[in-house]
Amino acid sequence: MSSSLPLILYIHGFNSSPQSRKCQELGEYLKTQKIPCDYVVPELDQWPGENAQMLYALASEALASRPVYIIGSSLGGYYATWLMERLLEDNPHYPVKLVPINPAVKPYELFEDYLGPQKNYYNGTEYELTHEHIEQLKHLEVPALHRPDNILLLAQTGDETLDYRKAVVRYQDCPQRIDEGGDHGFQGFEETIPVILSFFSPLLIPKI
């Protein structure tokens, strides 16, 4: 990766992967529009604690020389919110921004209904979701958002998996775009990419 271009870090959701639709659409858009950035989509492990350590190491190293712009989808939005706050603990002036997309607000509560065998159908990984996973997620909850102006919430009212109203309250001090209808996968994501990039930086807006 370049050491000077902005880093766009995409954090995927529960049992998802870098091969998911939004990850691929964003990567293709950045490539075809020749957006001056580096794009990274880490493949998350089943363990929240390990994911948090990996994401923090990646982002903190990048912030030594360039801005970091984070996108988090569903459970990835929960990770991303923790990550941004953790980075701001190191330096409250770090150039970091966040766009959570249909984010999970308290995923540890939802996971009570998913305890037991799980399978990631993208990579075939099978594992057991346990109370230890839930406890690790609880440790990543942050009580307050210290740079709300640097967070843009994207949510759709038709989300069939998560209650969008909880995200509206969680990110109430942040800029928000709430679309009527849609679904958990966030319909029309590709058309929303320019909105995300312009929020991150004018330098990332596609040239006409």
Residue ranges and their predicted role:
Residues 82-86:
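Active-site signature of alpha/beta-hydrolase-fold catalytic machinery across serine-
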Residues 13-14, 74, 157:
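Residue-level signal for short, function-critical loop segments
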Residues 4-66, 184:
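Active-site catalytic motif of lipid deacylating hydrolases and related acyltransferases
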Residues 67-72, 99:
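Short beta-strand immediately N-terminal to the catalytic nucleophile in serine-hydrolase-like folds
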Residues 71-81:
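Gly/Ala-rich beta-loop-alpha elbow adjacent to hydrolase catalytic centers
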Residues 1-3, 207-208:
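Eukaryotic N-terminal low-complexity, Ser/Thr- and Lys/Arg-rich leader segments
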Residues 94-208:
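The alpha/beta-hydrolase serine catalytic core
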Residues 55-59, 80, 192, 196, ...:
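Generic hydrophobic alpha-helical segments
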